[in-house]
Curated annotation (Swiss-Prot):
Gene Ontology CC: cytosol; mitochondrion
UniProt-annotated binding residues for ADP: G212, G236, F341
Originating species: Kluyveromyces lactis (strain ATCC 8585 / CBS 2359 / DSM 70799 / NBRC 1267 / NRRL Y-1140 / WM37) (Yeast)
Name of the protein: Phosphoglycerate kinase
Homology family: Belongs to the phosphoglycerate kinase family.
Length: 416
């Protein structure tokens, strides 16, 4: 799966066509009020570009929340239609389902350039292909899924996916369109361009920074990156498992991942074989409880962490070593913060690392922040626009970094 060879919306002829755009309008709601319109704003460039090309109609589709394959008004996209209309300064026709006669008639009788927003795709079990009933997974009927996909396909002449956050899901609206031209929107295209830059053709030295609690959860990620990077910073909770196994450091009550511990020697062996430098913390900010009001102190790895205390951030010496490693790199991928940044006493390691990667990005290097917690960090400290690329998809970016194919990307047409 080459990330850089996929058709984009700019390669399509959309004039006079019905254009289906799978967007990610999974916005946070407080009742019917949208608390952050960021995801709607992010989709505007693709929508506005298509509008300028005078399409017959634009059909927008998204999921919202987890309605579990049934209609639940709490997860209706109706409030999104109003917000989108305000942002586009143009009426948006909200349809009360995503398939069916009313939807088909509305789209086929569209006024030129009309913008439709379909109701939540996940109100139908056929979108995800299953639902949970009493804790058990119940699969959708195969014929019903095929029909649902045919109904969605019948609303369009061309298909555009601009929802990177769900590109790792083989859902009907992501892989179910029987149309000849299937392209990436600007948002998805930017994601692919940056991940291709790092994973297919990085400017070296290439550094990956990993945080997170468990080695076992990140095993595929580490294993795949060891074939690609020149250096690897390991921070966060999983650093303690590495320190314990490799150096027999006293880690007190810090996170220890017994399953992950068995995998550490193999990973280190692979790093040596591939000439990858692994950088681990050498000192820690520790707390006597997992809380913002914990008592804190700084200890070195030689001193060890006493019983009853846990490591919740890296210490000043580690911050210097991490910053020096960042300063050497030309391509950086960061997935997972090095400390519990949500608590002020344990946020300094994350802040220092963020300063270092921002400086690197500003100096013209490529810095990619994977979605999830690390993207939250970039937003919290207001540096999103100072970093080459902050990914919009936690799960999808993780799977790309693990070396997996994303169904939604594989499904797109290749450039001729």
């Amino acid at each position: 799966m080459s990330l850089s060879s996929k058709l984009t919306v700019k390669d399509l002829d959309v004039t006079g066509k019905r254009v289906f755009i799978r967007v990610d309008f999974n916005v946070p709601l407080d009742g019917k009020k949208i608390t952050s319109n960021q995801r709607i704003v992010a989709a505007l460039p693709t929508i506005q570009y298509v509008l300028e090309k005078k399409p017959k109609a634009i059909v927008l589709a998204s999921h919202l929340g987890r309605p579990n394959g049934e209609v639940n008004d709490k997860y209706s996209l109706a409030p999104v239609a109003d917000e989108l209309s305000r942002l586009l300064q143009k009426p948006v026709t909200f349809l009360h389902d995503c398939v069916g006669e009313e939807v088909t008639n509305a789209v086929n009788n569209a006024k030129d350039g009309e913008v439709f927003l379909l109701e939540n795709l996940r109100f139908h079990i056929e979108e995800e292909g299953s639902r949970k009933v009493d804790g058990n997974k119940v699969k959708a009927d195969k014929a019903a899924v095929t029909k649902f996909r045919e109904q969605l396909s019948s609303l369009a002449d061309v298909y555009v996916n601009d929802a990177f956050g769900t590109a790792h899901r083989a859902h009907s609206s992501i892989v179910g369109f029987d149309l000849p031209n299937r392209a990436a929107g600007f948002l998805l295209s930017k994601e692919l361009q940056y991940f291709a830059k790092a994973l297919e053709n990085p400017t070296r030295p290439f550094l990956a920074i990993l945080g997170g609690a468990k080695v076992a959860d990140k095993i595929q990620l580490i294993d795949n990156l060891l074939d690609k990077v020149d250096s690897l910073i390991i921070g966060g909770g999983m650093a303690f498992t590495f320190k314990k196994v490799l150096e027999n450091t006293e880690i007190g009550d810090s996170i220890y991942d017994a399953a992950g511990a068995e995998l550490v020697p193999k990973l280190v062996e692979k790093a040596k074989k591939n000439n990858v430098k692994i950088v681990l913390p050498t000192d820690f900010v520790i707390g006597d409880k997992f809380s913002a009001d914990a008592n804190t102190k700084v200890v070195t790895d030689k001193e060890g962490i006493p019983s009853g205390w846990q490591g919740l951030d890296n210490g000043p010496e580690s911050r210097k070593a991490f910053a020096a490693t960042v300063a050497e790199a030309k391509t950086i991928v960061w997935n997972g913060p090095p400390g519990v940044f949500e608590f002020a006493p344990f946020a300094k390691g994350t802040e220092a690392l963020l300063d270092a990667v921002v400086a690197s990005s500003q100096a013209g290097n490529t810095v990619i922040i994977g979605g999830g917690d690390t993207a939250t960090v970039a937003k919290k400290y207001g540096v999103v626009d100072k970093i080459s690329h902050v990914s919009t998809g936690g799960g999808a970016s993780l799977e790309l970094l693990e070396g997996k194919e994303l169904p939604g990307v594989t499904f797109l047409s290749n450039k001729q």
